[in-house]
């Protein structure tokens, strides 16, 4: 556990250096905490990492500066995320338009990959203690291919990194969404409206049974 916390400290420190050139606005005060006390700058939920993955059925995350609040991070240009993956589960391909992400494996084995703007694919399998970086705005994924649970921690270089899921954006966007002809043309298929509707329904159901990502 001590080694894990050292790695996490280094991870956060690295991302904090990156935020010096990030797009989040600079503070005009030392920090953004009303009536601060010492505990505002401490976060004690890492104690729960001694038994990562316990009882997890589907991948989920807890954003440290939101649930529970880590008010000491407010305005500092950082976000922190804890992931727990059920067996053979994944975080679907998505992007963070406003942040670079550094992912650290806490338990299990995680497949990680991204594609760059030249359509080159970079992928590897990560083990406990490994770190992988997802450059800002690039499409990426995380997957637990194992039969057991896995967990990891990410630090992002913006407190509001944004999340754009390819599948959710394509099939379940709010409002009118993408026209069926646009989707079928993009996928290179001669699909009837009913087939596209079936894909949309499948994605909508999947979004209902996974958690907030």
Q: Where do the model's predicted regions map?
A:
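A short, N-terminal "cap"/entry segment at the start of jelly-roll beta-barrel domains
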Residues: 3-81, 189, 193-213
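Double-stranded beta-helix
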Residues: 31, 120, 124, 141-213
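Beta-strand elements of modular eukaryotic interaction domains
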Residues: 69-72, 81, 92-94, 101, ...
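A generic fold-level signal
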Residues: 73-77, 97, 147
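Core residues of folded domains in eukaryotic genome-function proteins
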Residues: 78-81, 87, 101, 128-130, ...
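Glycine- and acidic-residue-biased ligand/ion/polar-headgroup-sensing regions
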Residues: 86-90, 96-118, 128
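Short beta-strand His + acidic residue motifs that chelate non-heme Fe in jelly-roll/DSBH
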Residues: 91-94, 112-114, 124-125, 134, ...
């Amino acid at each position: 556990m001590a080694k894990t916390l050292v790695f996490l400290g280094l991870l956060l420190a690295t991302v904090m250096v990156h935020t010096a050139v990030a797009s989040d606005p600079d503070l005009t005060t030392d920090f953004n905490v009303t009536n601060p006390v010492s505990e505002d700058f401490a976060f004690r939920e890492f104690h729960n990492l001694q038994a990562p993955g316990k009882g997890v059925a589907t991948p989920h995350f807890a954003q440290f500066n939101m649930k529970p609040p880590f008010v000491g991070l407010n305005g500092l240009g950082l976000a922190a995320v804890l992931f727990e993956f059920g067996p053979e589960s994944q975080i679907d391909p998505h992007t963070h338009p406003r942040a670079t992400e550094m992912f650290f494996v806490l338990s299990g084995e995680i497949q990680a990959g991204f594609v760059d703007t030249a359509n080159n694919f970079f992928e590897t399998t990560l083990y406990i203690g490994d770190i992988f970086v997802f450059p800002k705005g690039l499409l990426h994924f995380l997957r637990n291919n194992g039969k057991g649970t896995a967990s990891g921690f990410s630090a992002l270089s913006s407190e509001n990194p944004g999340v754009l899921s390819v599948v959710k954006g394509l099939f379940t966007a709010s409002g009118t969404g993408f026209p069926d002809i646009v989707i079928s043309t993009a996928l290179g298929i001669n699909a009837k409206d009913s087939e596209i509707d079936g894909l949309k329904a499948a994605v909508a159901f999947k979004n209902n049974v996974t958690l907030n990502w």
